[in-house]
Amino acid sequence: MNVFNKKPANSTLLITNWSSINWPDVIKRVTKIQQQIFLAEKMLQQEKDLTQKKILQKRVTKLQCTLIHSKFNLLLSIKKVTHKYLINRQVQVNKFTDLDKFNLFEKLKCVNIKLWKPLSINTNNINDKSIVKDLILQNVLRNALDPQLEARFEPTSFFRTGRLLIDAIGSIFNKVGPKKKRTWALQIIFNLESVNKDFILNQLGTFPYLNVLNEYLIRQKLIWNTQWQNTCIVSLIPILMNLCLIGLTTELNIRYGKNNQQISTGPSLVQWLNRCVIFCSSESEANNTLQKLKSTFCQYRNINIDTANIVQITEGFDFEGFNIRLYNADKNNPLDKRKKLLIKPSKLSIKLVMEQLKAIFNKYKAQSLGFILNQINPIIIGFAYSWRNVVSSSAYKQEKPCGTLP
């Protein structure tokens, strides 16, 4: 099967102004090359002949080079980065006009990525336009790296392209139910700051710009600890850090069928970035799993476990702003042994919303009501969007939910 794109990546590209760009065509061209990279990587994993493996490796590398040098990829990256700035009102970032975006394209299309020096991102220099350029070039590399890693990531990893946090919550709902045998949850937060960088780079194989990725990994501590979470959408660091957790399902002997349905009877796993929840049938199984991860998995990758909690699901636990707990089906009848699983916004996430709203009210007391509404609406809409698929009606009905407005 031919996985090469017959047309050059930059064919028929003529841009006079930003508003004249045919975005469906740009997305189509980038997606086509990404699909070819994914297909070639899948074939590489299934191939057993060493000669054919080398040929497929060259195909993957050539396709990635084509995509990295594609101006369509650069256009899409500029649109993605600048658009995320505009819609994230919680971070004060300079707005970009169409002329600014076009000028960015004219400057970056001549940049040699091999000679680019990665920058450190923090909340103090986020308004710097050089940081914006760095994020755009990161996204150019990420678009070429994503399909290769998509072919390798396990079904339990949800922090990747095309997945959302609500998908991880939905997976938890399917794994932990009233009729399920796994009634204990092992919560683990990995500390990835001291991860073995050689292990990550070896996972990338023949990626064309390993030296640039290595430079980003050297600066991982500054980028990983930043509170400006919007960079996770376009930054290379989170997806590179996910690489060191590949093999977690193999370590736990978790096996999946053709439709990504778990067929093994042992622990079950849900992973989001550096956090994971392992569901076990007993407390002893959870303790054994934790010791196994510490002794083999973490030691080989040179990573540490920040926190590890073992809780019973009937007591409930928090995961990324949500509370997961098994409740009695009938509160009035203590003899009724039936259970139901409810997922609600956690008290901490509700408190966080109230603190953000309170800070805005205190900061803009002298401003008009319309100005204040423009500031608080994005926050309310954002949390309402993330809570819409869970049991959240009680959070809106509370008069004083974990913190009150002035």
Label for each model-derived stretch:
Residues 1-110:
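Non-catalytic, polymerase-adjacent accessory regions of viral genome-replication enzymes
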Residues 41, 48-60, 72-81, 89, ...:
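Short coil/turn segments at secondary-structure boundaries
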Residues 139-144, 148, 243-251, 379, ...:
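Amphipathic alpha-helical segments in well-ordered regions
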Residues 2, 10, 33, 283, ...:
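Active-site and adjacent loop segments of nucleotide-processing enzymes
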Residues 107, 116, 120, 167-296, ...:
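Conserved polymerase palm-domain catalytic core
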Residues 82-94, 114-138, 151-164, 186-187, ...:
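Short, conserved non-catalytic motifs in the polymerase core
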Residues 15-16, 124-128, 153-157, 185-187, ...:
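Glycine- and acidic
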